[in-house]
């Protein structure tokens, strides 16, 4: 469904979907859906807006998945600032973490939710609402050849982060090595 959503937003096999997220269920969906529909670019949510914008520009990201404004988190605000400096981003998909809370906390979030003054021109949509509209099987032919499936940024210790390409085969190999040599069925891992 996530891959179909990204394709419905104009993402082709060589287009980039970036996500600026903490670890949550939707992070895995954005990772796998982005790599299936096009090229996925995970971005560290702890980077400052200028660094995130540099990664978005360097990867030519067209869609960004991030959090909806949430109490005690600045991920949404930081990402909105970055998107303002990344002119090729045409859509921002937001994830509301309130869905993970139970009453009474879930009742308080709408009252405490910080404002997120958006200064960018990208269309803002709800990730889960839009994904629910999609088919559960791919609406497009999956590419059967090895290709760039992910763009990961470096730490940026000597300036702005640089981007490293990862092929589908490399991602699969890393998963195999991890499951064979490093981890057991008791471990929880997001790969790559």
Residue positions per predicted region:
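Conserved acidic residues
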Residues: 15, 53, 62, 90, ...
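Short beta->alpha linker loops
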Residues: 22-23, 47, 70, 74, ...
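Conserved AMP-binding/adenylate-forming
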Residues: 2-50, 189-192
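Well-ordered alpha-helical segments embedded in enzymatic catalytic cores
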Residues: 1, 26, 51-54, 170-177
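Structural core segment of the AMP-binding/adenylate-forming
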Residues: 8-9, 39-129
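Short amphipathic alpha-helical segments
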Residues: 30-32, 76-80, 106, 166, ...
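Conserved adenylate-forming
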Residues: 6-11, 134-147, 151-192
